[in-house]
Amino acid sequence: VVEGQYNKLEIEKINEVDAIVVLGGSLRINELKNKYNIEWGDADRFFGGLKLYKEKKSKKIIFTGGKMPYNLTKLSEGDVLKKYAIEYGINADDILVTKDALNTFEESEAVQELLGENKNIILVTSAFHMKRAKKLFEQKGFNVTAYKVDYKTAPIVKINFINLIPSANSLSKTEIAFREILGRFYYNLLFQD
């Protein structure tokens, strides 16, 4: 229900755009005795953006500078992703990082400040997050090609007893879906016409 809005695109069918925009939420930064420990969560966002760049879908890649309240460090997520992208061979001059953003709405504003309006972008985020993210970026005047990654669900081909046993993983996926539905509801109320 949450992930099904947009099908995954084949890269060769995607046109070149002004920028590839990789949304935050793919890692957690922990600081211990002035050393940083990076924990990957939804790394598919990062690697999906790199793949699009290497396939020459844009000359620019933007990492949003997510700085979540639980990351009590000086580094933003965008800064860390830029560092890793350079290590993976992306030209530093082709990488932009937005100012700090706490949520998807702030990410859309920060990208708009960098690019302006009426730009064509490929938006890279988790499948469950795409519907809300795409809507917010379109409201900022972007022409969005949705590139979904990090699918949390897969179709059940055959139902058997194992599928019916509750699991912590299923509970976690339910929590993600519930949070996303609440986020959609909130933004629908906020931006009613």
Language-model features, listed with the residues they occupy:
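A structural signal for short, hydrophobic/glycine-enriched beta-strand patches
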Residues: 1-174
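A transmembrane-helix-recognition feature enriched in membrane-embedded lipid enzymes
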Residues: 174-193
